[in-house]
Amino acid sequence: MLGSSIVEQWAVCRPADELHLITRDDVDLRDRGATRAAVAQIQPDSIIHAAAVVGGIAAKKANPTKYLLDNLLLDSSVISAAIEARVPELLYIGSAAVYPEVYRQPFVESDLLAAPLEPVNEGYAIAKIAGAKLCEYASSEYGFDYRVALPSNLYGPNDDYSLSHGHLIAAAIAKVHAAHVAGDAKVLIWGDGTARREFTYSTDLAEWLVSQVGHLGQWPARINLGVGHDHSITEYYEAARRVVGYTGGFDYDTDKPAGMKQRILDSGMAHTLGWSPQTSLEDGMTRVYRSYLSAQ
């Protein structure tokens, strides 16, 4: 999702640049030899590493080994290939999942490794922490500008709308739409609906990141990127209900995991560099719903 948004924004904002895309169809980025060969052939000035194995709570709970191992392989492969090719600049797309389960809110960048991680996200988070620290070490040891973006949860066009792997907003839109079409009286929500999450529209993030490539030396080692406010799970489902036009209600399965109670970022450091997301939740979810309908 973010990768496709970056490609679209690059064409708009930097049309004169020579952009090389490496998708999973081109190279298995878990394969260190294949990744090394691809980077050596292209010899880029900058790399945006947005590849990751991602999913919702259900998927991470069912396959923790996959989320840890695949992301460790991806990140070590890409970053080591960049180091070997002496690529001067790399932007690593991390995750707010790297922050502790129970700690002060909002999170600041120095809160990394300050307390235990959320158990459901632990495997994925450990891999993303390793990727972030690898960038930090490479920058310190070799003098490269390898920096880490730590976005809040993201939503936007081209998301994964599957109920097994989709993130909250995409899954909510898919479930509410299905209930609307079927005439179901209620939609089931995991947990009690009170857990709070911060979501940023992927196009806003992509546009700003594209503007930053070539200037990552001005960044600290890692930087939070969020909208600065959060909503409860129920509030996101209510927004999906408004966007879809669904008139039914909600049921709650409190036996299912809902993740940590709150995760919100302090993006003050990014604001000093010009970060200022503009898309409201209602506008963003309306665009996502249109994208969902066009994909059906």
Locate predicted features.
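N-terminal Rossmann-fold NAD(P) dinucleotide-binding loop
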Residues: G3-S4
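C-terminal substrate-binding subdomain of Rossmann-fold SDR/epimerase-dehydratase oxidoreductases
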Residues: Q9, A178-Q296
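Adenosine-cofactor binding site in Rossmann-like domains, unifying the SAM/SAH pocket
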Residues: A11-A37
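NAD(P)H-binding glycine-rich loop region in Rossmannoid oxidoreductase-like domains
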Residues: R32-L72, E84
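Conserved Rossmann-fold NAD(P)-dependent oxidoreductase catalytic core, especially the SDR/UDP-sugar
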Residues: S76-N121, R147
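NAD(P)-dependent short-chain dehydrogenase/reductase
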Residues: V102-D111, E136-V213, Y237-V244
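Active-site helix of classical SDR
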Residues: L113, G123, A127-A130
